[in-house]
């Protein structure tokens, strides 16, 4: 011990005298000063009450707010539009692509059908993400019948605004998605939605982007099959494999990870870089009127992998419920989602997909069940919708026998299909239109009133089969239509 102290004095005199004087006159920190907890390894028996992990695998929460504007972009089509269907069939029948003819899902009408999902998706945005800066709806020129075009938060963007005329008309979502970044006035940060995707709980801007502007991209465990594209692949796999080959040739990275069927945060500058790198290949894709083997999946595959590889995005997870509305299991999914609404078990989003119309095992009344679910989960009318008259407002007019006013007010609403005939909460509109038409027929004996009364009372009674007064009125107008002597 003495030799070690002598050695310390010779080699480190400063430390020797420091320790000597501290022992003679220790520092006094005062009675209120307590020692800090000592971080020890998990094997130490000392100070176990104060063990603190030095590192953690948990991500650090971004302490800074997202302050930049975030837009939302939808793609939408109205399959009930006669002009649209005429053009679709014309180009579909004139297609010479062997791969197109062998892929029913490329042209199947289910891909284009609209059941007002867009209306409910916007309702979900207004309720669960009211911070959204602006909403753009990209269409082939159609306008949703329920949309209030005077609303300043929603803008319709025709295909002709963002796609060169040589590639129009197009019925290929990959073509449309490749040009979304060209929307005039679009913010650098935006979220791409299909019209069948809805939010299911409150989400903040930081769920989609970091405060520094990185996009958060929602990765899954699914993998794009290895190997190059072949005729057995789906059209989505064709487009994703083509995108993978472009990415591999440029970066050496072989992309396999797929992303969730949900919302897709986007960076406009990433799309501009992709256009600059692969303009020629994108234009080959844009020549395809329908999904085809030379497509590129820009919005939900190429953008995502390129953004992550170039440090403009990061991969993360989300909770998304995705199912086919025609599936027999859909009814149970609706019940589960409604039961979990507002709880911690609610998903972040719902994707109500419609697979090919050739599906043989189909849920009975699947359209009515879908409408019932949507109206129950998203009952609050958004500011983007044309306001419908309330039940009490119409009843007051009927009370004063102002049948012509009721008729002229409700007929355009029903004719424009602002209300779906499967939507029971709004069935009163069919009832009062039928009722007013019934009394107008009684007064004037004009056949078109009787036909309107019969048609709308039938719809109402189908949804409300025990409504005795409606059944009586329906019987009256139906009997009147029978030729005398029968």
Swiss-Prot record:
Keywords noted in UniProt: Exopolysaccharide synthesis, Transferase
Keyword Transferase on entry: yes
EC number of this enzyme: 2.7.-.-
Molecular function per GO: transferase activity, transferring phosphorus-containing groups
Claim: tRNA processing is one of the keywords in the record: no
Top EC category: transferase
Region: Disordered, residue numbers: 38-58
GO biological process: polysaccharide biosynthetic process
Note: Stealth proteins are part of a protein family that is conserved from bacteria to higher eukaryotes. Family members were first identified in microbes as proteins that help pathogens to elude the host innate immune system. Microbial stealth proteins are involved in the biosynthesis of exopolysaccharides. Stealth proteins are predicted to function as hexose-1-phosphoryltransferases.
Family indicated by similarity: Belongs to the stealth family.
Function: Part of a group II capsule biosynthesis locus. Part of a 3 gene operon, deletion of which prevents synthesis of the bacterial polysaccharide capsule. Capsule is important for the resistance of N.meningitidis serogroup X to killing by normal human serum. In Serogroup X the casule is a polymer of (alpha 1-->4)-linked N-acetylglucosamine 1-phosphate. This protein is probably the capsular polymerase.
Protein name: Capsular polysaccharide phosphotransferase XcbA
Originating organism: Neisseria meningitidis
Lineage: Bacteria, Pseudomonadati, Pseudomonadota, Betaproteobacteria, Neisseriales
Primary gene name: xcbA
């Amino acid at each position: 011990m003495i030799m070690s102290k002598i050695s310390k004095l010779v080699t480190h005199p400063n430390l020797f005298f420091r320790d000597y004087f501290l022992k003679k006159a220790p520092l006094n920190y005062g009675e209120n000063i307590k020692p800090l907890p000592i971080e020890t390894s998990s094997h130490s028996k000392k100070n176990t009450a104060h063990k603190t992990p030095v590192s953690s695998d948990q991500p650090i929460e971004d302490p800074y707010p997202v302050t930049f504007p975030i837009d939302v972009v939808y793609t939408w089509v109205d399959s009930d539009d006669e002009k649209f269907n005429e053009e679709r069939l014309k180009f579909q029948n004139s297609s010479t692509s062997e791969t197109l003819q062998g892929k029913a899902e490329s042209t199947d009408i289910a891909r284009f059908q609209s059941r007002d999902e867009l209306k409910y998706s916007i309702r979900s945005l207004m309720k669960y993400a009211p911070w959204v800066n602006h909403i753009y709806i990209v269409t082939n020129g159609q306008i949703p019948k329920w949309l209030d075009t005077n609303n300043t938060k929603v803008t319709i963007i025709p295909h002709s605004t963002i796609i060169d005329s040589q590639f129009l008309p197009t019925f290929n979502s990959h073509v449309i998605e490749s040009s979304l970044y060209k929307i005039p006035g679009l913010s650098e940060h935006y979220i791409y939605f299909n019209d069948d995707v809805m939010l299911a709980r409150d989400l903040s801007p930081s769920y989609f982007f970091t405060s520094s502007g990185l996009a958060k991209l929602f990765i899954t465990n699914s993998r794009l099959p290895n190997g190059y594209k072949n005729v057995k692949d789906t059209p989505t796999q064709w487009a994703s494999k083509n995108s993978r080959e472009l990415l591999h040739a440029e970066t050496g990275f072989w992309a396999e990870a797929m992303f969730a069927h949900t919302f897709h945060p986007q960076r406009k500058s990433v799309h501009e870089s992709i256009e600059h790198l692969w303009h020629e290949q994108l234009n080959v894709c844009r020549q395809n009127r329908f999904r085809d083997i030379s497509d590129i999946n820009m919005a939900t595959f190429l953008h995502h992998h390129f953004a992550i590889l170039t440090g403009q995005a990061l991969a993360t997870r989300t909770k998304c419920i995705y199912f086919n509305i025609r599936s027999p299991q859909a009814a149970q999914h609706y019940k589960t989602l409604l039961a979990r609404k507002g709880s911690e078990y609610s998903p972040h989003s719902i994707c109500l997909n419609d697979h090919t119309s050739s599906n043989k095992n189909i849920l009975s009344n699947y359209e009515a069940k879908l409408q019932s679910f949507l109206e129950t989960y998203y009952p609050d009318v958004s500011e983007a919708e044309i306001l419908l008259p309330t039940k009490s407002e119409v009843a007051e007019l009927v009370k004063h026998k102002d049948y012509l006013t009721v008729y002229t007010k409700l007929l355009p609403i029903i004719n424009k299909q602002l209300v779906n005939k499967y939507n029971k909460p709004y069935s009163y509109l069919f009832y009062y239109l039928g009722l007013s038409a019934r009394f107008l027929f009684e007064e004037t004996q004009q056949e078109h009133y009787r036909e309107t009364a019969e048609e709308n009372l039938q719809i109402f009674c189908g949804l409300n089969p025990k409504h005795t007064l409606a059944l009586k009125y329906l019987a009256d107008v139906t009997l009147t239509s029978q030729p005398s002597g029968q």
